């Protein structure tokens, strides 16, 4: 796919699609609640559609009426054994979170995915889940998919210290703990996105927090709700960066989720001196309108507890850093190596081929800026983030064509991406 390059400016207003993390969890909680839950602005990206289909295969009635998705919840006890293996597509979120849901069921199921997902280790989930009394196994010592799980209706509670800051592992254990007999305790390493915890409360459940400890009582039931999903800050990130680095630009993003565990990119933009304002802040919905304008940017350091709050945005933040004055250092981001690709190497290779100066490290990157960009041929390797990052980078390319291979990966999280990009050029 040939990408549009070297635009003069980007101007306009965009309402980004519903948050992917919240959309996944919406389908899960709606299925596990009793009654009909109605969701507005749910994402229809391929990953979320995978989660939706899996719960249909588990016996849940889900109706997509365009603006509204209705989930006819059956509770933990109402899920049915699937007739076939469960297809997770490319979604690491789906396979990890649903592992926790299936942990307390009295049937066996096998979960598989595409070639990319089949290379992603699942042992971070399988090891602690196995300690709760179920049987779960994958391929090789790292438990690559397919995963086969034989649940246990009499799950043992667990006390588990998370070895890494992973919201997916934490959430899988929470879903299992909700089905266990007694109290489970999960000890967090660092702050991670807390959508699962928030939604437990939204659906009438309870959690107790003590510092980095989360205490979960087993045997809880959830009540159907009506919920509006805020816009995905991970999707908004591409427009935030575009508005900051494309000359003469001003972009307004409406209804963007600003959950404090996800706003690391906003902290980075402030540290770099970007022109950004938040308005129409809704404290209850944790959303706001964000406006950005072309800015003179300075380098910064991105590390430590900031990393889990922007892990999915690091590819586009790397592009941002190529246009900042000075040397930006990203470290403590080894989690990027086990995304759809080795994201550290793939991002560095892609942007370097376009003229950037990036040194990949074991746990991050060193980015020297500002640098002019030019045309190149880039492969997404099936990673939607790489695709959208490249599309924004192409807007700065002065010479040569930018050709994107496997551009269809963008549909994983943002099917309307190019439509929205074109609207900013009009």
Curated annotation (Swiss-Prot):
Q: Check the record and name the InterPro entries matching this protein.
A: Enolpyruvate_Tfrase_dom, Enolpyruvate_Tfrase_sf, EPSP_synthase, EPSP_synthase_CS, RNA3'P_cycl/enolpyr_Trfase_a/b
What broad class describes the main subcellular location of this protein? cytoplasm
Would you tell me the Gene Ontology cellular component terms?
Answer: cytoplasm
Which amino acids does the record list as binding phosphoenolpyruvate?
20, 92, 120, 168, 385
Q: Which pathway does the record list?
A: Metabolic intermediate biosynthesis; chorismate biosynthesis; chorismate from D-erythrose 4-phosphate and phosphoenolpyruvate: step 6/7
Keyword vocabulary terms for this entry: Amino-acid biosynthesis, Aromatic amino acid biosynthesis, Cytoplasm, Transferase
Protein's cellular compartments = Cytoplasm
The EC number(s) attached to this protein equal: 2.5.1.19
Q: Which GO terms describe its molecular function?
A: 3-phosphoshikimate 1-carboxyvinyltransferase activity
Record field: catalytic activity: 3-phosphoshikimate + phosphoenolpyruvate = 5-O-(1-carboxyvinyl)-3-phosphoshikimate + phosphate
**A Pfam family reported for this protein in Swiss-Prot or TrEMBL:** EPSP_synthase
* Active site location: 312
Provide the assembly information: Monomer.
NCBIfam families linked? aroA
Q: Which PANTHER family match?
A: AROM/DEHYDROQUINATE SYNTHASE, PENTAFUNCTIONAL AROM POLYPEPTIDE
**Assigned protein family:** Belongs to the EPSP synthase family.
Q: What name does UniProt use for this protein? A: 3-phosphoshikimate 1-carboxyvinyltransferase
